[in-house]
Amino acid sequence: MDEGIPHLQERQLLEHRDFIGLDYSSLYMCKPKRSLKRDDTKDTYKLPHRLIEKKRRDRINECIAQLKDLLPEHLKLTTLGHLEKAVVLELTLKHLKALTALTEQQHQKIIALQNGERSLKSPVQADLDAFHSGFQTCAKEVLQYLARFESWTPREPRCAQLVSHLHAVATQLLTPQVPSGRGSGRAPCSAGAAAASGPERVARCVPVIQRTQPGTEPEHDTDTDSGYGGEAEQGRAAVKQEPPGDSSPAPKRPKLEARGALLGPEPALLGSLVALGGGAPFAQPAAAPFCLPFYLLSPSAAAYVQPWLDKSGLDKYLYPAAAAPFPLLYPGIPAAAAAAAAAAFPCLSSVLSPPPEKAGATAGAPFLAHEVAPPGPLRPQHAHSRTHLPRAVNPESSQEDATQPAKDAP
């Protein structure tokens, strides 16, 4: 049986030494899968884990920086200082929501127009929306130009002021104007224009009532609380711009009558006179008598101030005589200047003229050039002496002088 299988005998005769030096390529292909995977991914695991994390963080920072550059300028200026990553992501989310809402609104408008329906908004509101959109585009272009060519940064105060001003103007332009009735055209106060012009231009609008008496001729009005120059147009109200410092309108200066007028104290001088010990405030100036003394310096003593005295500036030397010890003309004015004051203010003649029953009491005192002196010799006056002429004038005596025009010689 063994003879029938010759190859079996030959296999049994083979020993281990017979296999030395033979090359079997199939033996090298039998490798485990784990070793093959390690060989293929050896280059991937060469870098440490911290370098991989650094690359990942760098990619995140690069994307956030690109988002920051793509954000509009008005969103960047809402936060002062450095924009953090979380702030950039929040602003990006806010901007995307606004764009989504705008896109949805435009899509609804397009569908409404395709279906033949009318616009959801009135034409005026649609125009305001279009203007607001164009205004925002122009403001964005201005900010980009300033940042590119003028080197403006969002951190600068002037850039923040410009954005605030543009936002105020856009807000006011979108506010609907309330129409005023009866044809009174009141000009609205522009908040944006007031913010741009500065503190000296900031003012409050005060409507001024027109003089509508029939038959009045237009004349130049010099009152301080008048909002127009005298030529008042019928049927239209004027608007006056007053400085913000005054909480009340400026008081009018009392006009002096030609005959029998009493000098009332100006309200602007009452505070200073009371503070200096001049007495109580003048609640009713016409009820109390006025003492009108004169302190006249000699021309030689007041020669150094005489070249600066002018008729137009004498009214600032007038003080109410009831606030003693202040005289009527203060500080001392020479006799020539007093005569000039009397000539500049003719209304003082009726006040300074003595009543008939008191003419004898002031016979020896010097009189001004425009008054009629009573009969009697005048006493000489020393060169450096003062002459005090106190005289009280009551409202009753002033009324009596007004009824006797012959005694008021100009």
UniProtKB/Swiss-Prot annotation:
Pfam families assigned: Hairy_orange, HLH
Paired cysteines (S-S): none
Keyword Transcription regulation: yes
Protein's cellular compartments: Nucleus
Cross-link (Glycyl lysine isopeptide (Lys-Gly) (interchain with G-Cter in SUMO2)) at residue(s): K31, K121, K240
InterPro entries referenced in this protein's UniProt entry, alphabetically: bHLH_dom (IPR011598), HES_HEY (IPR050370), HLH_DNA-bd_sf (IPR036638), Orange_dom (IPR003650)
Domain Orange stretches: 131-166
Sequence ranges assigned to domain bHLH in this UniProt record: 44-99
MF terms in GO: bHLH transcription factor binding; DNA-binding transcription factor activity, RNA polymerase II-specific; DNA-binding transcription repressor activity, RNA polymerase II-specific; E-box binding; histone deacetylase binding; MRF binding; protein heterodimerization activity; protein homodimerization activity
Keywords for this protein: Biological rhythms, DNA-binding, Isopeptide bond, Nucleus, Repressor, Transcription, Transcription regulation, Ubl conjugation
Alphabetized CDD domains for the sequence: bHLH-O_DEC2
Expression triggers: Expressed in a circdadian manner in the liver with a peak at ZT10.
SUPFAM superfamilies: HLH, helix-loop-helix DNA-binding domain, Orange domain-like
UniProt-listed GO biological process terms: circadian regulation of gene expression; circadian rhythm; negative regulation of DNA-templated transcription; negative regulation of myotube differentiation; negative regulation of transcription by competitive promoter binding; negative regulation of transcription by RNA polymerase II
GO annotations of cellular component type: nucleoplasm; transcription repressor complex
Region named Disordered: 209-255, 360-410
Predominant cellular place of this UniProt entry's protein: nucleus
Tissues expressed in: Expressed in skeletal muscle, brain and lung.
Quaternary structure (record): Homodimer. Heterodimer with BHLHE40/DEC1. Interacts with CIART. Interacts with BMAL1. Interacts with RXRA. Interacts with NR0B2 and HNF1A.
Known function: Transcriptional repressor involved in the regulation of the circadian rhythm by negatively regulating the activity of the clock genes and clock-controlled genes. Acts as the negative limb of a novel autoregulatory feedback loop (DEC loop) which differs from the one formed by the PER and CRY transcriptional repressors (PER/CRY loop). Both these loops are interlocked as it represses the expression of PER1 and in turn is repressed by PER1/2 and CRY1/2.
Protein name (record): Class E basic helix-loop-helix protein 41
Native species: Mus musculus
